[in-house]
Every structure is written in structure tokens, then in C-alpha cells.
Regions:
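Extracytoplasmic/lumenal acceptor-recognition loop(s) of multi-pass membrane glycoenzymes
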Residues: 2-25, 37-111, 155, 161-179
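A structure-centric feature marking long, well-folded core domains of fungal metabolic enzymes
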Residues: 28-32
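Flexible, solvent-exposed extracytoplasmic
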Residues: 107, 112-194
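Intrinsically disordered, low-complexity boundary segments flanking structured domains
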Residues: 33-43, 103, 135-138, 147
Length: 194
């Protein structure tokens, strides 16, 4: 009986619900072209390290799949401290993955997020500009354009911050905007309202 149930379950849910591998690799060449455009742009600006993100993820590891440095990642050895930090500032987390979903201009800058891939608009139109585009065939016959946008206000990988800012930054609470605002007010005005 168990064997019959396994066969029926696999036949009903296993085969029809699997994804075609082509859906994962059809845009690889477009990403390769745009990754090269990002590297060339970063090199021209003297930037050695930066991160990129995709507006809408296909997997939890798009950075690894499409070969770009990403905030979003899946790892079976994810740190609970990083998960807590991401959650407190409003980014999506689960017990073994972190995502850029929920990113704001401030968190994008803090994480050195310099480029964003999108088949439409960017997350922050007033803070970014179109760098390049590449086309590919989606689903075998639909022409799709992938854009890469450059954030104009990205911070470098390392930057100096007053030690009192870190000790006074209030990461408690459930509102990520209050927590982000706490960082800014603590860094700029020593915690006074601005």
C-alpha cells in the first residue's frame, strides 16, 4: 500500500509540478553581458567591491546562479545573528536564507548595493539610472529585456562610523523604519531628533 501511495503521489504531484531547467538558464547570457557592464562601470569609478541584486528573484541563490555578489543567499549554515539583524532592519529572512526583499535606499547604501537587475523598473527610480540592457528569449518564444540599473548612492564596503553610534543604535522593536531612523539619527546627531 505504501508503494502504491508513493507512485500515485509522485505521478500526481511530482512530474507535473517540476520546472523546466531552461527557465533557469535562458537568461544566463543576458546576465553575463550585464555583469560585464557592471564590472566595467565599477572599474571606471575605481570601485573594487560592490553588490548587485535582482528585483524579482528566481531562486534563493540568484547571485550564485548568475555570478554576481548578492545580499540574498541560501545557506544551510546561516547565522542566527545575521538573520536577527536582517529582520530588524526590514529585510526578508527565513531560518536558512536572507533576501534583499524589503530593501530601502538606506539599507541598499549600507550593503554596498550598487546595481539592480530588473525586467521592468528599478526599486528606487529617483536614486538610480539605467546602465545597460540585454535581451533573451523567455519561455522559448517571448523576447524579454533585462535591465541593469546603477544606484547613485551606494556606500563603499568599508566606511567609518562613530563607535558611540553602534552602541547607541536601538535595534529593538518591530518597526524596521524606526530602527533605520535610529541609525541615522544616532550617526548624525547623537540620537537627537532631526
Amino acid at each position: 500500500i505504501i508503494f502504491i501511495e508513493l507512485i500515485l503521489n509522485f505521478t500526481i504531484t511530482g512530474i507535473p509540478s517540476t520546472s523546466n531547467r531552461d527557465a533557469y538558464v535562458e537568461s544566463n547570457e543576458a546576465f553575463k553581458q550585464l555583469n560585464e557592464a557592471a564590472k566595467k562601470d565599477a572599474d571606471a569609478d575605481g570601485v573594487k567591491f560592490y553588490r548587485s541584486e535582482q528585483l524579482s528573484h528566481r531562486t534563493r541563490n540568484d547571485g550564485a546562479l548568475f555570478k554576481y555578489n548578492s545580499i540574498s543567499t541560501f545557506s544551510s549554515v546561516s547565522s542566527a545573528a545575521i538573520e536577527d539583524y536582517f529582520t530588524s532592519i526590514g529585510l526578508q529572512t527565513s531560518f536558512n536564507a536572507y533576501s534583499s526583499y524589503g530593501i530601502t535606499p538606506l539599507t541598499a547604501a549600507l550593503f554596498s548595493l550598487r546595481y539592480e537587475y530588473s525586467t521592468g523598473d528599478t526599486s528606487f527610480p529617483s536614486e538610480s539610472s539605467l546602465l545597460s540592457s540585454a535581451s533573451y528569449m523567455a519561455d522559448g518564444n517571448n523576447q524579454t529585456t533585462l535591465n541593469i540599473y546603477k544606484y547613485e548612492k551606494s556606500l563603499p564596503l568599508g566606511f567609518v562610523i562613530n563607535s558611540s553610534t553602534m552602541s547607541e543604535w536601538d535595534l529593538s522593536g518591530s518597526d524596521p523604519f524606526t530602527i533605520q531612523n535610529s541609525l541615522v539619527t544616532t550617526a548624525i546627531s547623537g540620537g537627537s531628533t532631526i
